[in-house]
Every structure is written in structure tokens, then in C-alpha cells.
Amino acid sequence: MMQLAVLICLSLVVNTFAQSCVQDSDCGNDDQCCLYSACATKPGEMFVEESGEGALAKVACSVPAPRALGFVGIHL
């Protein structure tokens, strides 16, 4: 019974994270932006960030951030 309660709790937490990831994205409801939210930009894109010592170019990461799954199974 305890395992089921933990599993339900984890599923709710993960689903909440996935929803907030899409909603908090600057790209509206674009799942691709959510997918690469841990990157500076989407793969292949660059942006320039101003700093005290001049502009610093950042390149997007080539591997997407792990997406939240709708269901998480664990074995206790």
C-alpha cells in the first residue's frame, strides 16, 4: 500500500513539473522549447549575452534536457 502511495505521489509531482515547464517557457506552449529548457537556446542557435567585459556568445547544448515522463515506475 505504501508503494502505491509513493508511486501516485511521484506521478503527480512529475506531471506538475511537465505542465509548468511548458507554461513557463518563453515560447508559449511549444514542447520543443520545453524540451531544450536546460540549454541556452535550441540546438544550432546562438545568442549573445552582454557582460561587464564585452559580449559572450553561448552555443546551445547538443543534447536535449531530459523530458518529464507522464508516468514514473519505481520498484521499492
From Swiss-Prot:
Question: Which Gene Ontology molecular function entries are recorded, alphabetically?
Answer: ion channel regulator activity; toxin activity
> Which Gene Ontology cellular component terms are annotated?
extracellular region
The positions making up the signal sequence are: 1-18
Q: Which cysteines are joined by disulfide bonds?
A: C21-C34, C27-C39, C33-C61
Q: Where in the cell is it found?
A: Secreted
Chief localization: secreted
Hey, what tissues is this thing expressed in?
Answer: Expressed by the venom gland.
Keywords from UniProt, A to Z, are: Disulfide bond, Ion channel impairing toxin, Knottin, Secreted, Signal, Toxin
> What function does this protein fulfil?
Probable ion channel inhibitor.
The record comments on the domains as follows: The presence of a 'disulfide through disulfide knot' structurally defines this protein as a knottin.
The protein depicted here goes by the name U14-hexatoxin-Hi1a
Instruction: Give the species this sequence originates from.
Output: Hadronyche infensa
